[in-house]
């Protein structure tokens, strides 16, 4: 998704009450940003925020974190959060490679990866959010029974992710090769998903966990 630069976005984000600061004072203490201590789910690459705000509204018993690196997009999520009166959703404006600056080990119950940039060129594989470098970060912050929910319209990225996760010691608990041809009442459609499914694009989805290590 190409984002149009908005020069005023950075000033808008500064000191916003729903945006987690980056001074490190709260690193590993994400629960302190919320009114209640509840399980934490995060979405990496939230875009315009339709998915994460819908989830937060449906599940008040869960705390949600939206992680988006584009300041020119993040303000939309902040606006939706305020309009909907969501007390269980906070935002981080940073790259996923910095995850362990915000979350301590085994703090997160679920990670959502929705329509991540496929980085189709082979030399850019390490930038994909299912590359082993990122999987190592996810394993570090996820609880032992934590999950990764992944959704894409890119067949190449889906195949790469299956291979990458398998090689990293993960297993799949659910897999959809054509999501919109199946009756999945729990599916929340993102802006991107709606646009491309209406054009006939196939949507791929899977849920995965890390194997537990036994001594």
From Swiss-Prot:
Residues annotated as the enzyme's active site: 117
Organism of provenance: Staphylococcus epidermidis (strain ATCC 35984 / DSM 28319 / BCRC 17069 / CCUG 31568 / BM 3577 / RP62A)
Lineage summary: Bacteria, Bacillati, Bacillota, Bacilli, Bacillales
Annotated residues for binding of S-adenosyl-L-methionine: 43, 68, 95, 117
Pathway membership: tRNA modification; N(7)-methylguanine-tRNA biosynthesis
Gene3D superfamilies on file: Vaccinia Virus protein VP39
Family that this chain belongs to: Belongs to the class I-like SAM-binding methyltransferase superfamily. TrmB family.
PROSITE patterns: SAM_MT_TRMB (PS51625)
A Gene Ontology term for the protein's cellular component: tRNA methyltransferase complex
Name listed for the protein in its UniProt record: tRNA (guanine-N(7)-)-methyltransferase
Gene Ontology MF, one: tRNA (guanine(46)-N7)-methyltransferase activity
PANTHER family per record: 3-DEOXY-D-MANNO-OCTULOSONIC-ACID TRANSFERASE/TRNA GUANINE-N 7 - -METHYLTRANSFERASE, PENTACOTRIPEPTIDE-REPEAT REGION OF PRORP DOMAIN-CONTAINING PROTEIN
HAMAP family in the record: tRNA_methyltr_TrmB
Binding site for substrate: 121, 153, 190-193
Function: Catalyzes the formation of N(7)-methylguanine at position 46 (m7G46) in tRNA.
Record field: catalytic activity: guanosine(46) in tRNA + S-adenosyl-L-methionine = N(7)-methylguanosine(46) in tRNA + S-adenosyl-L-homocysteine
């Amino acid at each position: 998704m190409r984002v149009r630069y908005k020069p005023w976005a950075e000033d808008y984000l500064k000191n916003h009450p729903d945006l987690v600061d980056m001074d490190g004072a709260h690193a590993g203490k994400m629960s302190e940003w919320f009114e209640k201590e509840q399980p934490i789910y995060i979405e990496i690459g939230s875009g315009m925020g339709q998915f994460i705000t819908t989830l937060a509204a449906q599940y008040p018993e869960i705390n949600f974190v939206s992680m988006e690196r584009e300041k020119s997009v993040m303000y939309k999520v902040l606006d939706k959060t305020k309009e909907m009166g969501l007390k269980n959703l906070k935002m981080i404006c940073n790259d996923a490679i910095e995850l362990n600056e915000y979350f301590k080990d085994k703090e997160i119950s679920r990670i959502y990866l929705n329509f991540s940039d496929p980085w189709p060129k082979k030399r850019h594989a390490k930038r994909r959010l299912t590359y082993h470098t990122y999987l190592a970060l996810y394993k570090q912050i996820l609880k032992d029974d934590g999950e990764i929910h992944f959704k894409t319209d890119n067949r190449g990225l889906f195949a790469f992710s299956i291979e990458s996760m398998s090689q990293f010691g993960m297993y799949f608990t659910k897999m959809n090769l054509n999501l919109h041809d199946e009756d999945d009442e729990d599916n929340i459609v993102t802006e991107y998903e709606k646009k491309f499914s209406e054009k006939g694009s196939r949507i791929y989805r899977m849920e995965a966990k890390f194997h537990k290590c036994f001594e």
